[in-house]
């Protein structure tokens, strides 16, 4: 089953647009795990157990594991996700952006070593940096487009004088991803909830692409505004889901032994807010 099909199935199964980001910071773990990087898997597994029936996807961020020499725990977590939440797709948040044989190895890392359903990529080096991932049938490649950070405007909002219509960079990227780059229907886009007008513009330019939308929760993005900008209930205009990510607001909702229960309550509330805005 393709990444797109798995997303649509998970959306229906769990009645959800919510993605929980797995960004483990040992310094924020509850006692007695506080500061203990050997407990990264245990912490993430508890979050998964508490939220797996509430989400459209999970999104582990590879840097939070690599910084603590915990790639083995990430492998263990990915295997755990496949076992306890087999119907929930997993997006490896890696934001890779190289070309050629290096990109081939990054694709192998994402799809063979970690067996992710999709991976995030930086397309700054052009289609050469995307194409190696499209050789993996059924896997998703989600390209940074209009990101949630304020500094994203430094490049993404600049107009391209040499392109017809002088679109902004993020607009041109959305058009490429919707059109000539999407050779096998595997692409999606990352667009931040913190810029709802740009989010609506990307959805208009890329009506069939899945959108991974960070920025709801700790970054201040509004759930209702996000859904209004990106969701299209009319199947004639789009068959692509939106994947609204929340990481810190869910992971660190509680700082004591009941942290998983607190995470579930925040996930429930966020899912409800997103669904109410459809």
Curated annotation (Swiss-Prot):
Pathway assigned in UniProt: Pyrimidine metabolism; UMP biosynthesis via de novo pathway; UMP from orotate: step 2/2
Presence of keyword Ribonucleoprotein: no
PROSITE patterns referenced in this protein's UniProt entry, alphabetically: OMPDECASE
EC number, as in UniProt: 4.1.1.23
Active site: 95
Gene behind this protein: pyrF
Keywords: Decarboxylase, Lyase, Pyrimidine biosynthesis
Reaction it catalyzes: orotidine 5'-phosphate + H(+) = UMP + CO2
Name of the protein in question: Orotidine 5'-phosphate decarboxylase
One GO term (biological process): 'de novo' UMP biosynthetic process
């Amino acid at each position: 089953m393709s990444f797109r099909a798995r997303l649509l199935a998970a959306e229906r199964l769990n009645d959800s647009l919510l993605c929980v980001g797995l960004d483990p910071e040992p310094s924020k773990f509850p006692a007695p795990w506080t500061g203990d990087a050997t407990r990264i898997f245990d912490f993430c597994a508890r979050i998964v157990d508490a939220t797996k029936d509430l989400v459209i996807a999970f999104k582990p961020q590879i840097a939070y594991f690599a910084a603590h020499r915990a790639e083995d725990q990430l492998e263990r977590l990915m295997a755990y996700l496949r076992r306890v939440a087999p119907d929930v797709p997993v997006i490896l948040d890696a934001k890779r952006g190289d070309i050629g044989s290096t990109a081939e190895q990054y694709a192998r890392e994402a799809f063979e070593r970690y067996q992710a359903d999709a991976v995030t990529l930086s397309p700054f080096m052009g289609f050469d940096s995307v194409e190696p991932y499209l050789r993996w049938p059924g896997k998703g490649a989600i390209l940074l487009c209009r990101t949630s950070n304020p500094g994203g405007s430094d490049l993404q909002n600049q107009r391209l004088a040499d392109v017809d219509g002088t679109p902004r960079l993020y607009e041109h990227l959305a058009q490429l991803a919707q059109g000539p780059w999407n050779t096998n229907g595997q692409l999606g886009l990352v667009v931040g909830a913190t810029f709802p007008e740009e989010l609506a513009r990307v959805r208009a330019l890329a009506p069939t692409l899945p959108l991974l939308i960070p920025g709801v929760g700790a970054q201040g993005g509004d759930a209702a505004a996000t859904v209004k900008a990106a969701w299209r209930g009319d199947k004639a205009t789009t068959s692509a889901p939106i994947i609204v990510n929340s990481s810190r607001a869910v992971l660190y909702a509680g700082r004591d032994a009941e942290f998983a229960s607190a995470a579930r309550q925040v996930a429930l509330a966020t899912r409800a807010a997103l669904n109410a805005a459809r």
